[in-house]
Regions:
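Acidic, metal-coordinating catalytic segment for phosphate/diphosphate chemistry
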Residues: 1-27, 105-106
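Hydrophobic (often cysteine-bearing) scaffold residues that line and stabilize catalytic clefts
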Residues: 15, 64, 160, 164
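Short glycine/proline- and charge-enriched loop/turn segments
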Residues: 39, 44-52
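Unchanged
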Residues: 57-158
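Charged phosphate-binding loop/patch that engages nucleotide di/tri-phosphates or the phosphate backbone
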Residues: 149-181
Length: 181
């Protein structure tokens, strides 16, 4: 049986539409979560336990902003937020050749992401990545922390670095804005 070449797969497979969240605290740092490993070997291989911002798929008929709010809550329990900005463009990333046809359930060539920046207005006790939504949602992270925005590309899995660099560029002015109200 002959398998499709990576080039053929890229031509055939679409991008998955996703929403991403850069959640800033009043000190201008961004919330990142460490990908939980072990539940799914494919996911473990795909992500390699890096840190990343909350993100997830946009459901059919769902607005990207609504998806961003939903994904943030489903992954962190956070709902105390104010919208600060929306990235001006969709951000794309492609899966590496060796993951095409298997990662993202084999249905996508990568992701097309719409990014939103929010200010966290709650108390840190609201953040719960281990039992998000009071345990209603599967934990995608096993830890979280606040991090400098410009450091994010070095903390993410290699094939998403350019996408994260685009997000950092889009939101570069926000840390200063939120620090000074």
């Amino acid at each position: 049986m002959q398998t499709e070449s990576p080039e053929a797969l890229r031509q055939r497979l679409p991008y998955r539409d996703c929403a991403g969240v850069a959640l800033f605290n009043r000190q201008g740092k961004v919330l990142i979560g460490r990908r939980r490993m072990g539940d799914d070997p494919e996911e473990s291989a795909l992500h390699g336990a890096p840190w990343q911002m909350p993100q997830g798929g946009i459901d059919k008929g769902e607005a990207p902003l609504d998806a961003a709010r939903r994904e943030l809550f489903e992954e962190t329990s956070v709902s105390s937020i104010e919208l600060v900005a929306e990235a001006p463009d969709w951000v794309l990333y492609d899966l590496p050749d060796d993951m095409l046809g298997s990662a993202l359930k084999g249905k996508y060539r990568g992701q097309r992401q719409r990014w939103f920046a929010f200010l966290f207005t709650g108390d840190e006790r609201e953040i719960d990545v281990l039992a998000p939504g009071g345990g209603k949602f599967h934990a995608e992270f096993d830890d979280w922390r606040w991090e400098e925005l410009e450091r994010l590309p070095e903390l993410i899995v290699a094939f998403k670095r350019d996408a994260y660099a685009a997000v950092v560029a889009a939101f570069a002015d926000i840390p200063e804005r939120v620090r000074h109200g």
